[in-house]
């Protein structure tokens, strides 16, 4: 007598903005400087994604809203095989959400901590894949400023993807960046020199230096310079001046020559473009079209039978988080019913104003919707671009390009 009960996926109105209810929360997998990350499944399409969520009040208190908005503005114009691409962004009363590609292979920092041995062949392919991503970012005038193992994720086949654009910046023409940004052990000499008022600024070569430090660390298990977050800047600059990088005698001469070119202290002489790196003899045999198509298989493939992340993230979300994601729906409903009653506890005026400004100026994005629009109006689009950036800039219905420009530029306490 058992009927055939098929669970049909829910159907959402195409014109309805994507929101939290469109996703099923599966588990927490990470946290970063600006929020936490969990695995989600979109209820209608059953597609899996990673969802990063950032508490609005905490972002305001830490003066991080501008960085979140900058990251959203940059990511909505990008799409590339070796980036972690943005699919949706939305908000509710508590949080800002970014839904991105799900990459279950873990980040390179995790695998270094698991004592994975990366062969020269694997690192050589990583360098090529990351070079294509950096060239793409350069085409859109973007300096990432935080290339490091923590921000490079692997997909299930072992290919690399750059993530975390929250301190990226955009430079046009001959402009140079001049602020101190990045993670000290991976920052190029010219970034420190700017801080000490000894330099004219910096540009794209800083990301290629970081690539060199990362590649060295993957091969050797430690970095070429003993630099930590607490190391004074004058000491770091002196280190660059007097210390020589030691390369393993077991590495082939071609790899050593490539690393030397990436770790050249003078940015004008450093390998810092796809053309530069394709001219390096060590990479003369590389089929770059095959690299772009992910047709070359890395020597290291993450374990498919396990989740390649720290399992304590899930425990923290379930036990320690004061506002856990899985209880959000009930919590928001309770808050809404309480608002306006004598039991409600009003926020201080400045914080309330900041929250309202964030709500008004948040950048909503829907790549799925943009693709539908592109299909309907393809004659309007720039079909020459491999990425989606130029086409997306012509379709403003799917995204809001505001930046938080006039309020909430200082932290506020609740």
From Swiss-Prot:
ATP binds at residues 29-37, 52. It is an enzyme of class 2 (transferase). Residues 23-283 form the Protein kinase domain. Residues 374-396 are annotated as: Disordered. The keyword Iron-sulfur does not apply. The active site is at residue 146. Gene3D superfamilies: Phosphorylase Kinase, domain 1, Transferase(Phosphotransferase) domain 1. Its cofactor is Mg(2+). GO terms for biological process: intracellular signal transduction. The keyword Transmembrane does not apply. It catalyses: L-seryl-[protein] + ATP = O-phospho-L-seryl-[protein] + ADP + H(+); L-threonyl-[protein] + ATP = O-phospho-L-threonyl-[protein] + ADP + H(+). Changing residue 35 to E: In a metastatic melanoma sample; somatic mutation. One of its GO terms (molecular function) is protein serine/threonine kinase activity. Keywords: ATP-binding, Kinase, Magnesium, Metal-binding, Nucleotide-binding, Serine/threonine-protein kinase, Transferase. Its EC number is 2.7.11.1. Belongs to the protein kinase superfamily. Ser/Thr protein kinase family. This is Serine/threonine-protein kinase 32B. It comes from Homo sapiens (Human). The lineage of its organism: Eukaryota, Metazoa, Chordata, Craniata, Vertebrata.
